[in-house]
Design a protein with these regions (language model features):
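Glycine- (often His-adjacent) and acidic-residue-rich active-site loop
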Residues: 57-95, 115, 145-147
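Internal alpha-helical scaffold of NAD(P)-dependent oxidoreductase catalytic cores
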Residues: 177, 330-337, 374-380, 386-423, ...
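NAD(P)+-binding Rossmann beta1-loop-alpha1 motif at the extreme N-terminus of oxidoreductases
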Residues: 304-354, 376-389, 400, 406
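ADP-ribose/adenylate-binding Rossmann-like module
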Residues: 354-375, 393
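Conserved CoA-thioester-binding segment of acyl-CoA-metabolizing enzymes
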Residues: 1-56, 98
């Protein structure tokens, strides 16, 4: 298998290191890539012909963060390993970035595409960060969405570059920014037309030859004077200022861990601050919430998206839609964004859709939403969930195989996860409004005839079960 990092040294001593992990659509930090990064830094340190290093990607994206299978392994390890053992294992990437940042031979990031999580943290550790000037490119730290925090220096370098409030907005929302916004925030050194990115990065690296690392030059907000001192209630107040409700702060421990990392690391060196950050990361690893969220909202969700997709060759040609009632207006909005031929037909029963497939067959279904009272419906029904932070679900209940396949194709057009259930009563509507204990009891009764993980995925994506639970069955398993 090809090495994950390949290098090319030019005559001026600029080493271009290209990350391109074989058999992956995106680069992600794995043990293999961390090993390769150590080898790269060893070479840069030892080779007198190397004076600087440009890090870029051989893929259309730069680096998409940590391998979440590896992160799930961290969660499993936390059940049996001690804190020092976990610190050594989980803190490796953060220590690598401290070493890279302080190197006498400067590193320059040439960010050619999406950089999330550990990918952005790698760029932040570099002396300079050049980014392709493409408004579609995303830079961010989405870890809070999986119940985690950026554990390789993200909670420390972002506030030192962008300032406290802008950094907290990124860290607590998990929302990415485009290159122009990143430039205004000070987390990007320059925007460069994509075709010129490597040449410009090499020129910047060349200009840095022989210069020592100076944190005061790198970080505009090094003194962290805008960061409040930690104290009773301060972390909760910071989170609340950035839109975190009291309930979410209580049930999602990542919010407190992120704010605590920033407050307690603010006036320390980067090496000391990343230790603070890692201790807070381990708070989350020893808490089952992060493990449940990673498992359900990422790993099992990806599996569901593959296994619940319509069969190859099944396609939607057109739709006829009956009058839609006010209580199901979400369907009106969703169908209004659909780029397929459709017509409204008042002759159809209210809240009904007829979908014509590629073969000309017509499939009918009742249109429902998750807030409808659970009730038996004759024939197929499509139950639409609200659009949530992790996506949207269309439950396909009571459909035959041909109907289910076509309705799954429609769900894909609507950017929704198609979840087929036997019906005639919607399972999402049945779970809506119940306590977690009641949901777990009901879901257990369904599990023998369904993939239990998909029940959890659908319940969380639909918003009928809180994301911190990982779904009713995952929550029950951890009790």
């Amino acid at each position: 298998m090809a090495a994950p990092i390949t290098t090319a040294l030019d005559a001026d001593g600029v080493l271009v290191a290209t990350i391109d992990m074989a058999e992956r659509t995106m680069n992600v930090f794995s043990v293999e890539l961390m090993d390769a990064l150590d080898a790269l830094m060893d070479r840069v340190d030892a080779d007198p012909a190397v004076h600087s290093c440009v890090i870029t990607s051989g893929k259309s994206s730069f680096l998409a963060g940590a391998d979440l299978e590896m992160v799930r392994g961290y969660g499993d390890a936390a059940r049996t390993r001690t804190h020092p053992q976990m610190f050594e294992m989980c803190g490796r990437l953060g220590r690598q970035f401290v070493r890279l940042e302080a190197s006498a031979k400067p590193y320059v990031a040439a960010v050619n595409g999406l950089a999330l999580g550990g990918g952005l943290e790698l760029a932040l550790a570099c002396r300079m960060r050049l980014v392709a000037d493409d408004p579609r490119l995303q830079l961010g730290v989405p870890e809070v969405r999986w119940g985690l925090l950026p554990g390789a220096g993200g909670t420390q370098r972002l506030p030192r570059m962008a300032g406290f409030e802008p950094a907290m907005k990124m860290l607590l929302s998990g929302q990415p920014v485009d290159p122009g916004t990143a430039m205004k925030l000070g987390i990007v050194s320059a925007l460069v037309p994509a075709p010129k990115l490597i040449d410009e990065a090499k020129a910047v690296a060349r200009a840095l030859h022989g210069s020592a690392y100076d944190p005061a030059l790198k970080f505009k907000h090094l003194a962290q004077t805008d960061v409040p001192a930690p104290g009773n209630g301060v972390s909760a107040a910071v989170a609340a200022k950035h839109g975190v409700s009291g309930t979410d702060y209580e049930f999602y421990p990542a919010y407190a861990a992120i704010v605590d990392s920033v407050l307690h690391g603010a006036r320390l060196s980067l090496a000391e601050a990343t230790t603070v950050e890692m201790n807070n990361f381990l708070r989350l690893m020893f808490n089952p919430v992060a493990g449940r969220m990673v498992r359900t909202l990422f790993l099992e969700r990806l599996r569901a998206e593959k296994e619940l997709a319509p069969p190859a060759g099944v396609a939607v040609e057109s739709l006829r839609v009956g009058p839609i009632s006010e209580s199901r207006a979400a369907w009106q909005a969703a169908l209004g964004r659909l780029k397929l031929p459709q017509q409204t037909d008042d002759a159809l029963p209210p809240d009904t859709v007829e979908v014509t497939d590629r073969a000309g067959a017509v499939h009918s279904a009742a249109l429902r939403v998750t807030t409808d009272a659970p009730a038996a419906v004759a024939g197929a029904q499509l139950v639409l969930s609200p659009q949530g932070p992790y996506g949207r679900v269309i439950e396909i209940a009571g459909a035959n195989d041909a109907q289910a396949a076509t309705m799954a194709a429609l769900a894909m057009h609507l950017r929704s996860l198609p979840w087929r259930t036997p019906g005639p009563v919607s399972r999402l509507a049945t779970l809506q409004g119940r306590t977690l204990e009641e949901q777990a009891q009901q879901a257990a009764a369904w599990a023998s005839g369904s993939d239990p993980a998909f029940i959890d995925v659908a319940a969380c994506l639909a918003g009928v079960t809180p994301a911190w639970s990982g779904g009713p069955l995952s929550w029950q398993a951890d009790r």
